Amino acid sequence: LGPNFNPLHTQGAVGDNARAISSYNSLLTSGLWQQDYEGKTSPNPDFCTEFTSAMENGKQVLHITLNEKAKFNDGTPLDIEALRATHKVLSDNKTYQIQSTGLYPNIESIEEDGSATRVKVTMSKPSYPIASLFSYVVHPKMTDTDFFANGLVDKPNSDYAAGPFKVAEGGWNSTEKTLTVTRNDKWWGEKPVLESITFRLLDTPAQRSAFANGELDAVNANVVSVYKELENVKNAEFRQGQRLFAGGVVMNPVKVDTPLRRAIMVGLDRKALSDTRFKGLPFNEALPGSRIHMPFSEYYADSMPQAADRKAAAAKILEEAGYAKSGDFYEKDGKRAKVVVNNFSEDNT
């Protein structure tokens, strides 16, 4: 949680940090888009009433209509200037130290289409999915490189934000690592149910103690040691839902060549890994077969490589690429094939 409350900067791009920021600046964390429970994406009417894509004169053109009620908390309108600022920041990962430019370098022009809230975006080449464009929208102030890097460090300023909550007066306590947000009286959308939310940074063991003592309302219990520890906490309810994420091992293509990466993917016993990871937990979902679509999506298809003999299939890939077995390991050009995987956790299970 913090200290950099800019989730687009590499130093603020942490999942828990972004979740806290989303309470008071949903425009920055989810942009013009929303998703339903099936994972289908559509324009968020609080910010955008139309977002279409079509080919015009051989070029992909996006037509965007912004909600005229939408404003940042300092009164700055959500209009073409905010989209231009977003394009400027997210197409330049050297100046602004963002994680990835995505499709933003493919934007050729951003023009008014009759008014400042009706915007025409022309792409230099067809780009998909369009929902990855303006899935973050920044206040024009964020184009200031110093402010982008340092302006929100230990200063979660909601003046440049737009969302159902705002940072409370003195809401960030950098010593105790707590952030409190309250209802935003400038919010034009649906009124939030809660009057305030307090986010608190705790290490994993401290979270469990705080939950057991009634200081926290919820805590993750996704490893067996935590689950067992919390089973007997009075009035605790265990709730299980679909995680909207399919993770995997990311291998550096500079250090691990394509044949070795392919061999690992074909030869890996994913079920054995899953059984080990979730042993002792009431979890029995099927292994995900796609890194693009969730199993409940209508577009889902299991695209993972299938082999009757994984070991033989992996060996064949390596040997066709010039690897040769030496003892228990494969080598190529005198170097042993290896991949180093680091896993960080505060829990020894």
Where are these regions (language model features)?
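Short, well-ordered beta-strand elements
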Residues: 1-2, 61-64, 86, 119-121, ...
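Ligand-site clamp/hinge motif
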Residues: 183-229
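N-terminal lobe/hinge region of extracytoplasmic solute-binding protein
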Residues: 1-55, 160
